[in-house]
Amino acid sequence: CCTDENALCSLKAHNVNRISFGLQSGNDNELKALGRRHNSKVGADAVKTAYKAGFDNISGDIMLGIPLQTSDSLIETINYMTSLPLSHISAYMLKIEKGTAFDCDEMRNAVADDDMLCDMYLQTVGQLASKGFLQYEISNFAKEGGKSRHNLKYWHGEEYIGIGPSAH
């Protein structure tokens, strides 16, 4: 996670108006299981630093089906995320792709089964709604005014500009 306030201020000064953080979880054991380089404190500090740098349109990602994740730890993650100055949350299910570090029996056996994933998804939708994050796409939730304009333009077939090494 980038916690350099000067870099964030520079982005803001160059008219970047939205920033997204791949937080994934508020549980350090789950983050470690994912091989993430940050812990929950570093993630929270990065979001708070972005807010302090002037960003008020900040998105965070939650991952469902992480090894070790339970219904209770998911609620803790949702509470962690909604305690931060986020206006948007994306919730994605872990998908193990062939040829990746997760493509092994140990990891496949550690992730939630389909029924549990469905329960976690429904739990996420309900918990986020109770915290003011309304669902507007299958995996996206926003507070009032926090919807991703890029996503909406994409789904409505409008033009947009992609910038960066993976832009298309």
Please report, for each region that a protein language model flagged, where it lies by residue:
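C-terminal scaffold of the Radical SAM
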Residues: C1-H168
